[in-house]
Amino acid sequence: MTYRAWNLKTLDRAAVRELTHAIAEQNTEELEYHSQSEEPWTEAQYNATLAAQQKETALLAGILAARGITDPTEALTLLAGEEELTDPMLLTDMDKACARILQAIDNEETIVVFGDYDVDGVTATALLYQHLKGMGAKVKCMLPSREGDGYGLSKNAIQSIHDKGCQLIVTVDNGIAAIEEAEFAASLGVDLIVTDHHLPHEVLPKAVAVVDPRRADDTSPFKGLCGAGVAFKLCAALDGCPPEEMLDYCGDLAAVGTVADVMPLTGENRTLVKAGLRQLQQTDRPGLMALLEEVGLAGKPVTAENVSYAIAPRINAAGRMDSAVTALQLVLCEDEDRAAELAHRLTEINVSRQETEQEIVKAAQELLDREPGLLEDRVILLWGQNWHPGVIGIVASRLVEKTGRPVIVVSIDENGEGKGSGRSVQGFNLHECIASCADLLLRFGGHAMAAGLSVRAENLPALRRRMNDWAARECPVLYTPPLECDLSIRLDRVTVESVARLDQLAPYGAENPTPVFLLEKAVVEGIYPVSEGKHCRLRLRQGNASIYAVWFGMHPEQLPYAMGDVVDAALNLSVYESARGPQLSGRVIELHPAGLGHAVAEQTALVQALRRGTPLQDEQKKLIAPVRGEIITVYRELQTRRWHAEDLQPLFAKLGEQQTGKTLVALTALEQVGLIAAVEHGGVKFWELVPTAGKKNLADAPILKCLEGE
C-alpha cells in the first residue's frame, strides 16, 4: 500500500484576525441595512452583532488565509463570487465564427453541431443546438459513438453530413486536432467552424474559424473554459449581448459541462457555475427536471458535488456503455413523460456501468494477486480480453487510488488490438512515458495526467518493460504527493454556524477544493456500517466534543482501527438537518494513528524503490535496513495480535514512525523466507505466522541480500 503524508498549511494569524474583522464588519453592515428597525442600530447593538459575526466567520477567514488570500478586499470580492464574464469577442476568430453562422441562417443553409460523447460534449451540443434553433436556423446535431467512431470529427462523419446536403459544421468540445478532417471537409465544399478547449497541436485545422481559448494567439483573458463554456460564449456573441444575460437561458447546461469536465472553479468559471447551479435548481427544461427528480434533487439546492456524483455519471454512462444520443435526447426533451423514461434509462445504464466497472476491477485485482511482482512496477500495465472499453479509464483511476502508481488498463478485442486508458499521479508525466514507446503503438494521445493508446496485443509485454525502463530513468523514486490540510481544528470551537459560512467558498471543484480539516488526537468511540457495509460511520471524540463522520468506500471489517484507538483524521465538514435541528457532520478522507508524520510516506517510497531494484544511496539503505534484533521485534509483535496487512499504519505507530522502512523490510524478509504470510479473511488480508519445521535463515531473504549489495 502507498501512504501519503499530510501537509498542514502555514497560517498567518494576523491575517486571519484582519480577514475575520473585515468579513464580520461587512456582514454586520448588511444585517443592519436589511433589518426591520426604522431606527439606526445603537452602538451596543452593532457591537454585539459584530462580535457574533466574528465568531461565525473565523473559520471561513482561516480557510482563506490558509489558501493565500490575505487581502480583505480580495477576500470580499471572492466571497461575493460575481466576477465579470469577459466579452466573448475577445476570443480569437469569434467574429469569423459569428459571421459565417449568421450567413448560414440568412441563407437557410443547414448547420450541423458536432459534439462529443461525454458530459461536456453533450451539454455543449444541446446548448448550441437549442440556441441556433431559437434563432431560426436550420440545424441538426450529431454525436460520435465511442466504440464505432472514436473521439472527434471523422472523415466518415463529414461524408455523411455532406451526403445529407449540409453546408456548415460547427464542432463543440472537439475539432482542434482535426487537421486531416478539416482538409477533407474543404475538399467536399463543407465549411467548418471549430470550437474547442483542448490544447492545440502546432498546426491548427484549416477552417473558417478556430475558437479555442488555448490557442497560442488567443486574446481572451480566461483560459479555463470547457467545451460548453466556449459554446456559451459563442451563443452570447451571436446574440450580441453581455454573457451575463445568457446565464438565465443556458447557464445550467454550461455549469453541468464545466463541473463534469473538472475545469478550474476559479475566475469566470466560478461566476458561471454559481449562476448555473442556481438556474439548474429551478430549471424549466423537462429533461433536466426529470434527471433531478431521478437522483432525488428535485426542489433541493444543487451543488457542484451533486453534479459530479449524481448527474454527470448518468450522462457519461450513456456514452460509455450505450450511445450518448440517449443523454442528448434527455437534455433536449420537451415532453415530461418521455423525459422521465429517459432519465430512468440513464440510471439503468449507469448501474450497468458500475457493475461492469466492478467486474473489471475485480479481474484486475485477481491479476495483481496472481502476479504480485506487478505491484513493484513504477507504471502498472494490465490487460484483459474484451474488457469494456467504455469503463477502462474509470478502472485505471480506481487502481491509481489504491496503488498510488500510474496505471494503464488495456482491453484486447477479438482481432488482437488493444485499446488502453491510463491515469497518472502528480509528478509523473504519463504522456511523455507513453510517447517514449511510440514505435510499439498504433496510436496514442493525452496529457501528463491521463492518456489513451492503441496497441497490438503481442507488443504489450515489451510496452510494459519499456515504460518501466523510462520511469526508472526519469522517476527513480516516486513519492506520493501529500494531502493538503487547510486548518487544524478543535471540535469544541467549531459551530454549525461557522461551518455553514463555508458555503460562501462554493462551488467546490478543481483548484477550489472542499476545505480539508485536521482533527488531531481523536478517540474512535463508535464504528457503524452504512449501506449494508459498503461504507462505515465513525464517532470521533476530541476532548468533550464529538462528531459523526462517514468514510465512503471503507467497509467496517477493512477498517484497521478499533474502538478506543487515538487517531488523526483528515475531514470535510458539513451541516445536515436532523430531527434535533442542524447538526455537524464529517466525511473522512484519511485516518492516521495520532501523531504519525512524513517519515511513513518517505520511507515507504524508499522500500518500494528497493523492491523494484532501484539503486539506493548508502544513507537511504541505512535508513531502512533492519538488524536481526529489529526483525525479531517485528515478528514478536505479529505474535501479539492479528495485524492488518494492507494498511500498516497502526503497526508503524506501535513500532515507531522512524522505524517504518525497517518494519517494511522486516515484514518482506519474514514473508520471503516463509515465516509469515498475508492471509485473507472476509476480504481483508492479515499477517499470520506460518508453522515451520526447522529453522529459517533470514539472511536468505532476497530483500536483505539486496540491501547488502549482493
Question: Which positions does each model-derived feature cover?
Answer:
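Acidic, two-metal ion nucleic-acid-processing modules in DNA metabolism proteins
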Residues: 133, 138, 270-313, 317-365, ...
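Hydrophobic helix-and-loop "lid/oligomerization" segment in the mid-to-C-terminal part
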Residues: 2-3, 8, 13, 19-23, ...
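Terminal, basic amphipathic appendages of nucleotide-handling enzymes
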Residues: 1-48, 52-56, 66, 70-80, ...
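Short amphipathic alpha-helical segments and helix-helix/interface helices
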Residues: 158, 182-183, 667
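Short, small-residue-enriched loops and turns at beta-alpha junctions
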Residues: 121, 146-151, 199-201, 218, ...
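Histidine/acidic-residue-rich, glycine-tolerant segments that coordinate divalent metal ions
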Residues: 172-225
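Short alpha-helices
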Residues: 127, 205-259, 630
